[in-house]
Amino acid sequence: RRSSDLYSIPNTKKLTLSTTFRCAKNIVKHAQKYTPELKAMDNAIDGVVREGSVINEAENGDFVLCRTTMPLVKLFFHFLLKEKKAIIRGSEIGLSLIDMTTDVENIDNLKQIWEEKLNTYKLSLLANGVINPEEDSDYASLEDKVLTLLFIARLSKNIEDLRLKIQSIFSDEIEGIILSTVHKAKGLEADRVFIVRPDLLPMTKNIRSQWEKQQEINLTYVAITRARKELVYDNKWTDED
């Protein structure tokens, strides 16, 4: 059947590609700040966009999203102390962190090696004319991985214990409270979604080009539209010591 014939079928309504079947009306209204053409279904529920506490409110089936990994790791251990089941989505993130422990003898060596590598990369950026290396997106990505690895290392007895902890934290299973970077949440959805460290969305301090700026806007849109019914911003919780 030709596509033009489909609209002759009774009760068939033409929808634009920007119409979302997933999100409640208030969530769509919020997302329109970043994607103005987005529209909700006429029969969508109103839904809720509000502030709240991820530590006190998050339950099984909820998503918790962040622009970077490090805050999610700290949240994972918060939930562990509260005896709440949680995982960080992305087994390949865990494998990448485990790869960073290859040929390392002990935790002290691990810390020294990766702090030196991070500093060396910073110096190379300076040598190549980058005025503020901390605001370079590649540096920020490496720094996030190093800080994540070293945080888990501080809670580990030795390198083998560190690897086991990493394997238990990062998973592709969908169970408990699902902690995820926005990148890893693409294509997923939940009735309720928390966003932590909303100051990192969009991550404007690392922007060097218009293309990067647009990618950050796209990520912010992705984060918002993972929520079907309720979107909760936690503006108070922070991973900063």
Predicted regions and their residues:
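The feature marks helicase ATPase cores and/or their adjacent C-terminal helical subdomains
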Residues: 1-241
